[in-house]
């Protein structure tokens, strides 16, 4: 079996990647562009990738390909319909980040409520050293306990975020689907969550109905001074509308671990805004990436490959 790993830098270098037990050849590339994909994969039986695009046109030129093993949960980079038509299996990994993502979200909540980014930025400019008092009060500090958290997406991540939030004294509301006519038990109507929540956190999948879920209209329905957190998918948010809501002061702040385009352009409006807005926190899509989570991820990727090859030999 010929295995090609197309974007190995999607795994931190200090995490060792196990090799399959069956006889194989292993070729690894740090990055692969769209123009390089076909040449690198044309003789491969198995491809490992995180984000390299496999659309219908690309898949049609890879007759030897049997399996695409994705080092992530999302499968948006693969045309699943075309892959099925061509007999190419696609395997992703779920559940590996069920601790690290919720912990990241809780950390962002505390960072926003206590204005940590602003205080940290000030210290690079020695502002405390210039103070005439033992402290100073340039940024608002509000308690997490007693705040209301609106969770959009009640899967394993959203549920765990809610559990942790309850543990630190927050009230948790799970939002019903935006256009739902009936509100399920355990959920709160979509607009009501926007109205009540001091913090909104996004954990829903990216679909045609959730793209731009948070836009100018929904932002206007949020409580003035509320915070927005997104560790889900970048396109869940209309980025320009978010910048406007921050600039006008309608939102108290935002924390993002994902963007519409990744990596973002240097002139992305949010990237530019973060340079001057202490209430805007951006982390580079690393909420999922604790050492234990990544170790679990690569282990499950290899398990997917091993199981696929075993099934292949049984046919």
Swiss-Prot record:
InterPro entries named in the record: D-iso_2-hydroxyacid_DH_PdxB, D-isomer_2_OHA_DH_cat_dom, D-isomer_DH_CS, D-isomer_DH_NAD-bd, NAD(P)-bd_dom_sf
Protein's name in the database: Putative 2-hydroxyacid dehydrogenase HI_1556
Classification via SUPFAM superfamilies: Formate/glycerate dehydrogenase catalytic domain-like, NAD(P)-binding Rossmann-fold domains
Stored CDD domains: 2-Hacid_dh_4 (cd12162)
Pfam family of the protein (one): 2-Hacid_dh_C
Active site: 233, 262, 285
UniProt key word NAD: yes
Keyword set includes DNA-binding: no
Record: residues binding NAD(+): 73, 156-157, 231-233, 257, 285-288
Family of this protein: Belongs to the D-isomer specific 2-hydroxyacid dehydrogenase family.
UniProt xrefs under NCBIfam families: PRK06932.1
Keywords tagged on the record: NAD, Oxidoreductase
Organism listed in the record: Haemophilus influenzae (strain ATCC 51907 / DSM 11121 / KW20 / Rd)
The protein's enzyme class: oxidoreductase
Enzyme Commission number(s) from the entry: 1.-.-.-
An MF annotation (GO) of this entry: NAD binding
């Amino acid at each position: 079996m010929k295995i090609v790993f197309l974007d190995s830098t999607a795994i931190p270098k200090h995490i060792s990647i196990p090799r399959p037990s069956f006889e194989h050849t292993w070729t690894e590339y740090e990055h692969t562009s769209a123009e390089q994909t076909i040449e690198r994969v044309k003789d491969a039986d198995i491809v490992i990738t995180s984000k390299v695009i496999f659309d219908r046109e690309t898949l049609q030129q890879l007759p030897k390909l049997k399996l695409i093993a994705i080092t992530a949960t999302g499968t948006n980079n693969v045309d699943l319909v075309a892959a099925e038509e061509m007999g190419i299996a696609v395997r992703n990994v779920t559940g590996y980040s069920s601790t690290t993502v919720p912990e990241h979200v809780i950390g962002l909540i505390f960072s926003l409520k206590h204005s940590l980014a602003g205080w940290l930025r000030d210290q690079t400019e020695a502002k405390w050293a210039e103070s005439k008092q033992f402290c100073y009060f340039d940024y608002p500090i509000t308690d997490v306990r007693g705040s209301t958290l609106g969770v959009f997406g009640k899967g394993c991540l959203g549920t765990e975020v809610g559990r942790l939030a309850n543990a630190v004294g927050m009230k948790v509301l799970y939002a019903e689907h935006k256009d739902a006519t009936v509100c399920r038990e355990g959920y709160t109507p979509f607009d009501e969550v926007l109205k009540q929540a001091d913090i909104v956190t996004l954990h829903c999948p990216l679909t045609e109905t959730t793209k731009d879920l948070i836009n100018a209209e929904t932002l206007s329905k949020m409580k003035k001074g509320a915070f927005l957190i997104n560790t889900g998918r970048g396109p869940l948010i209309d980025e320009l509308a978010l910048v406007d809501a921050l600039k006008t002061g309608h939102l108290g702040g935002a924390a993002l671990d994902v963007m519409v385009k990744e990596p973002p352009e240097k002139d992305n409006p949010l990237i530019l805004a973060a340079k001057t807005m202490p209430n805007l926190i951006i982390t580079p899509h690393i909420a999922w990436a604790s050492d234990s989570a990544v170790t679990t991820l690569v282990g499950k990727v290899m398990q997917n490959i091993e199981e696929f090859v075993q099934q292949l030999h049984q046919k």
